């Protein structure tokens, strides 16, 4: 029993406690105005069988593996294999170089059209990015911008489309397609680090057997083709696309336009076996007969 309650509300409070029922689970109610979402009963959607159906392996969780078709030969074994991506990591890649991009580099002065153009000029002019470690084997000259190309150039690329060759020869230029092995390609793209090592310039390797027909064909302007067949191939292409073939022998830049590399040569003006001394700015040439025979073979 509680002690005496002080104040006027004392007797009234005691009477109220005596009259009110005791607090229990039977008389608990939520506060007036409060809301609580009603719990969904099991029988509304997934009750009884819990969505697993009536007996069987599907209800008991012993389903077969993915792709099993009840014992018959599955689909992934009925269809034969085909090597769509076979040898994809060994395929040669060529970065595209459009005529529009080449004209843009010439207009900005990043590529000099009065000098023979090869990968060294294109890489130094930030026209293309070549990564021999990622199976890059050079550039492919494509015909985008053939209608607006106006420069007269002597360019060496690895692949070239027929229309791109026609667009350059229409302006009096010369195109040569040449192969570079990965080591020669890396030296050609980054000559300064190679010269600083003080090593002799190696010989350029010949193309693999699969590429020999391409580089020995005068229609592709291959560097291994017979030079006597080039005039006929140039005239045939001019007739096909309907333009007058300029006579480059009367051009003031004929010496530049007619310059070509030897099949074993990497740089213009530098023969295999030579050593470029960057410190003294000199070129060292071999004099031993065996070395001369090796690098000239």
UniProtKB/Swiss-Prot annotation:
<keyword id="KW-0689">Ribosomal protein</keyword>
<dbReference type="Pfam" id="PF00828">
    <property type="entry name" value="Ribosomal_L27A"/>
</dbReference>
<keyword id="KW-0809">Transit peptide</keyword>
<dbReference type="GO" id="GO:0005762">
    <property type="term" value="C:mitochondrial large ribosomal subunit"/>
</dbReference>
<keyword id="KW-0687">Ribonucleoprotein</keyword>
<dbReference type="InterPro" id="IPR030878">
    <property type="entry name" value="Ribosomal_uL15"/>
</dbReference>
<dbReference type="GO" id="GO:0006412">
    <property type="term" value="P:translation"/>
</dbReference>
<dbReference type="GO" id="GO:1990830">
    <property type="term" value="P:cellular response to leukemia inhibitory factor"/>
</dbReference>
<dbReference type="InterPro" id="IPR005749">
    <property type="entry name" value="Ribosomal_uL15_bac-type"/>
</dbReference>
<dbReference type="InterPro" id="IPR021131">
    <property type="entry name" value="Ribosomal_uL15/eL18"/>
</dbReference>
<feature type="region of interest" description="Disordered">
    <location>
        <begin position="27"/>
        <end position="68"/>
    </location>
</feature>
<protein>
    <recommendedName>
        <fullName>Large ribosomal subunit protein uL15m</fullName>
    </recommendedName>
</protein>
<comment type="similarity">
    <text>Belongs to the universal ribosomal protein uL15 family.</text>
</comment>
<dbReference type="GO" id="GO:0005743">
    <property type="term" value="C:mitochondrial inner membrane"/>
</dbReference>
<keyword id="KW-0496">Mitochondrion</keyword>
<dbReference type="InterPro" id="IPR036227">
    <property type="entry name" value="Ribosomal_uL15/eL18_sf"/>
</dbReference>
<feature type="compositionally biased region" description="Basic residues">
    <location>
        <begin position="37"/>
        <end position="53"/>
    </location>
</feature>
<dbReference type="GO" id="GO:0003735">
    <property type="term" value="F:structural constituent of ribosome"/>
</dbReference>
<feature type="transit peptide" description="Mitochondrion">
    <location>
        <begin position="1"/>
        <end position="22"/>
    </location>
</feature>
<comment type="subunit">
    <text>Component of the mitochondrial ribosome large subunit (39S) which comprises a 16S rRNA and about 50 distinct proteins.</text>
</comment>
């Amino acid at each position: 029993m509680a002690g005496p309650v002080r104040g006027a509300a004392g007797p009234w409070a005691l009477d109220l406690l005596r009259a009110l029922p005791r607090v229990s689970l039977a008389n608990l109610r939520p506060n007036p105005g409060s809301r609580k979402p009603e719990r969904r009963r099991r029988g509304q959607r997934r009750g009884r069988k819990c969505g697993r159906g009536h007996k069987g392996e599907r209800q008991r969780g012993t389903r077969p593996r993915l792709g099993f078709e009840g014992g018959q030969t599955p689909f992934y074994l009925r269809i034969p294999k085909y090597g769509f991506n076979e040898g994809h990591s060994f395929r040669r890649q060529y970065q595209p170089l459009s005529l529009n991009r080449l004209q843009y580099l010439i207009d900005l002065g990043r590529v000099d059209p009065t000098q023979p153009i090869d990968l060294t000029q294109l890489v130094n002019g930030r026209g293309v990015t070549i990564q021999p470690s990622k199976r890059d084997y050079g550039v492919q000259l494509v015909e985008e911008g053939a209608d607006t190309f106006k420069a007269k150039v002597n360019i060496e690329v690895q692949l070239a489309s027929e229309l791109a060759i026609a667009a350059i020869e229409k302006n009096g230029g010369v195109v040569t397609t040449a192969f570079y092995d990965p080591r020669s390609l890396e030296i050609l793209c980054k000559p300064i680090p190679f010269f600083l090592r003080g090593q002799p310039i190696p010989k350029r390797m010949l193309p693999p057997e699969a590429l020999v027909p391409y580089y020995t064909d005068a229609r592709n302007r291959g560097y291994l083709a017979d030079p006597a067949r080039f005039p006929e191939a140039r005239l045939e292409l001019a007739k096909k696309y309907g333009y007058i073939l300029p006579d480059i022998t009367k051009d003031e830049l004929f010496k530049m336009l007619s310059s070509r590399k030897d099949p074993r040569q990497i740089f213009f003006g530098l023969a295999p076996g030579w050593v470029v001394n960057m410190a003294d700015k000199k070129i060292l040439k071999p004099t031993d007969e065996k070395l001369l025979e090796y690098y000239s073979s």
